[in-house]
């Protein structure tokens, strides 16, 4: 059978696939075996060895030690009786020397040596799920029946019934391939290396002080574990790092092979001072990574080695008492324990000696080991599967658009963005942002007054205050350079498309050009007026922040800009007594112009605002026609309503006549008034008319000492409005935006009860009046 000079010679990383399909080369393998081990290495009858080992299971544990040598190979007899006697004498001398050591005596007195029990012989290391797992059957059971390989650190399978309780010797093994040299074992026989069920623990001194290395096969466990639901193949074992297989190559009941150098290193460590050797140094001692010390008392071991094993988490499981019968449930997925991870990270890479292998086997083994090392270096470099999985996923999810810009380009973009924030007047250059935060501050102040909760601190962007350098842009000029564009090429570019030229009259072109130019001028005026409006709205903030001596100048500047806004709206030219309405109507035909007028009205004086209202009332039918699509005129109702409360009765009457298109003289009005009809069919016009009637009635009732002429004009206007409201159909009448509350008394003075009810129905004032 095969022999190995030391523990490191066991080829643990051989691949099962590398040994298949080599039946044609049996003769070459036999020749290499003879050259390596000698011609008589496989001459013994291994079937008889099987039978002797099977008979040992029924004998007492006391007789096991006596029959162990008979169950081994015939090479054990080569030691001789004198060598065995010498080993016994040396072991007794070591035991006597140890008992004379006071440190060991204290350890023995405090904690006696545990006696091995039949049921808990191997429980110190091999029974816990958090410690190393059970060894499994031969790795190469078909080709090399004499070699046993440890099971990689896997969780212990829970008991699953009577089938697992049966002994390994009672199971029928599958038929194996027949070798011309070794032969085929019987089907019912136990594998080579299977120990008895109970075996005595060899003494520690006999393991260390053995005269020469003793080759012992590691025995089989009582039953097979089932890691991860299935057994690992040799291919999977080869993919496991070699350092992880160094946890326990032999059970605690079988001593490993210790070379003289290893024994010297082990005995030399006993002379060290306590604490001089770290767990990592202890794990690097060759041949000491197994379990030969597991069967010894932990206190005795600590005293012998000189307390060179501090109680670390990675080593506490090796030298502690046997764990409980019911280990705690594992909350983590099955995998190597913390002590195995320590050994994996601290122990050196285990490279078995492959000099006895066939050259073809050695080449295949080296190739597989190189592939495994490169794979583990790429995927398991940090030692954590979860972190590698996450890092691999992060690598797959990498942004394809990352690192497309250089740092210089990123800084350039950042500088451009910061240039937009560098301003001497942030309120003017960043108007919307500043207004947005002003609204937020007002809301927070209102919440503070109401006391609805703690004040919320809002982060506000602080713009850097730097001087803004104004410079005129000058295009780059290349004097005398080739390829310079000529003026004719710029003014008259080459025609790329043949456009169809339509003949148009000069009058049409002139008229269209005038309309286009007029609209452009109106848009320019609106933009200029809007800039003045923003400045005027900003004067309130500037007035509060200015000093006392600066405020008069600010007020004069504000008045000047308000007058400029009014002139832009009315289009008053220098030396012109009364401006025309055409300019204002053009502004009111544009949606932005109508909204601008609604914002300007509160800043104008009463006379200026009244002029704007009069102009709007005169041209209201045309403005209603232009506003059919936008419907922006209702935004003017609120500022007009506020203005009416500052106008006298005469102005109200004149405004009503302008709105109804009545002549200023007392002539008899026409029976039909299309101007007033258009006003009543629009919700803005009807709402403005009702507000004017309500305000005029209040003024007439509050001042009875009015002139008769003015009173007659008011009565005439009221009769005209009432007649037109009664004449227009209800379907054509628009729904007003707002309804005054004093219209009942207003109409009751000029119509009877029947007409009053009809007016109430049309204007939908029933609920408001009653």
Curated annotation (Swiss-Prot):
Q: In which tissues is it expressed?
A: Ubiquitous.
Q: Which Pfam families match?
A: PAT1
Could you state one GO biological process linked to this protein? P-body assembly
Composition-biased stretches (Low complexity):
314-323, 367-380
Q: Which UniProt keywords apply?
A: Cytoplasm, Methylation, Nucleus, Phosphoprotein, RNA-binding
Q: Which family does it belong to?
A: Belongs to the PAT1 family.
Q: Which PANTHER family match?
A: PROTEIN PAT1 HOMOLOG 1, TOPOISOMERASE II-ASSOCIATED PROTEIN PAT1
Q: What is this protein called?
A: Protein PAT1 homolog 1
Gene name per UniProt: PATL1
